[in-house]
Regions:
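Short beta-strand/turn segments that mark the catalytic/cofactor-handling region
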Residues: 128
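Extracellular C-type lectin-like domains
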Residues: 141-145
Length: 186
């Protein structure tokens, strides 16, 4: 990754803003919109919903996320979990990712945190980027939180750390596509 100096920062911010704005209204044949309880998300064709067998290969615990999307290699994926009435977003008035970060720090002090923030799109999404470890492997993570009628949703995009430059734009495109999808009781 190339270092930027003070003169380049405005250009860098404009590029990032352009990437986020492009992804917002994505409608093409490279993927599909998937609708879940209270929201929809654009998912590239390379990802598919995991069945129980695939999920158990990645997540050994019985307590798995509600929604799991994997590539065929299963080294890249996105998980989404409804937190229900836990109320992480809006509780305490602070940045909700701060409490998630504190929890992550207690689990593994080897994690390396890069950046965190909040999007200002259709759905307010709080996020944090960090590197974690699975055994000896380094893993890039983009963890995010947003709110729907069903409650708070916790999502994570992960990939092998050495491939994050390839997958990070795809992860952001998926996250930026999240839209509210009111439950019409049908």
């Amino acid at each position: 990754m190339e270092r930027i100096d003070g003169e380049d920062i405005d250009y860098f911010l404009l590029q990032i803003e352009e990437v986020f704005n492009e992804a917002a209204d994505r409608e093409n044949d490279d993927g599909e919109w998937m609708i879940f309880s209270g929201f929809r998300i654009w998912v590239p064709k390379i990802f598919s919903l995991a069945d129980q067998e695939s999920a158990s290969e990645i997540f050994w615990s019985e307590y798995r996320p509600d929604i799991m999307l994997f590539t065929d290699k299963k080294t890249e994926g996105m998980t989404l979990q409804t937190l229900g009435g836990m109320g992480i977003i809006g509780a305490g008035g602070g940045h909700p990712i701060e409490s998630v970060k504190q929890l992550l720090e207690t689990i593994d002090d080897r994690n390396v945190y890069y950046d965190m923030g909040v999007t200002d799109g259709n759905v307010k999404i709080y996020w944090i980027e960090y590197k974690s470890f699975a055994g000896e492997e380094r893993v890039y993570n983009l963890l995010f939180l947003f709110q729907t009628e069903a409650g708070d949703i916790l999502g994570t995009f992960y990939c092998i750390f050495e491939e994050y430059e390839k997958w990070k734009p795809i992860a952001w495109e998926m996250i930026q596509s999240i839209r509210e999808e009111p439950d019409e009781g049908i």
